[in-house]
Amino acid sequence: MVLLISSEVSARDLTETTSDAKKEVVEKTNEVNDAKYGGGYNHGGGGYNGGGYNHGGGGYNNGGGYNHGGGGYNNGGGGYNHGGGGYNNGGGGYNHGGGGYNNGGGGYNHGGGGYNGGGYNHGGGGYNHGGGGCQYHCHGRCCSHAEFVAMQAKDNTQN
């Protein structure tokens, strides 16, 4: 009887050990894939080539995230919103996008410039050839919305 119990325990131990080994292999495979392709759906860390869907850290190459995505070393697109640029050719973001070191386009709206770039609207300039954007023009110069409205009213009363 003692021998039978001992055999059952050994068989159970062997099954658990095999199961643990399989889990470890799956975890290691996932780690390798994460390192290789990077990123996750949400709050995904970057990777060599990747990023995450939301709040994704960038990556070495072509990294970025959909929202609040950090850029990347090379061709790092920003994010849809509040996207950081990239070291080289880093596009900004759709909104409040930071530029990039080189040829960094600003953002669609309130885009910071870049080392060599500018933004579409309210864009800060750039170190070199950085054209800013100008939403309101008052007699050939940029002005605020309030000044623009006042100028329009003044022009309408004079005509």
Swiss-Prot record:
Q: Where are the sequence repeats?
A: 38-49, 50-61, 63-74, 77-88, 91-102, 105-116, 124-135
Induction or repression: By environmental stress and abscisic acid (ABA).
Domain of life per record: Eukaryota
| Region (7 X 12 AA repeats of G-G-G-Y-N-H-G-G-G-Y-N) residue spans | 38-135
Specify whether RNA-binding is a keyword of the entry. no
What is the residue range of the signal peptide feature?
Answer: none
Coiled-coil intervals, chain numbering? none
Q: Which InterPro entries match?
A: ESR_Regulator, GRP
Keywords assigned by UniProt, alphabetized: Repeat, Stress response
Q: Which Pfam families match?
A: GRP (PF07172)
Return the similarity comment. Belongs to the GRP family.
What this protein is called in its record is: Abscisic acid and environmental stress-inducible protein
Q: Which organism is it from?
A: Medicago sativa subsp. falcata (Sickle medic)
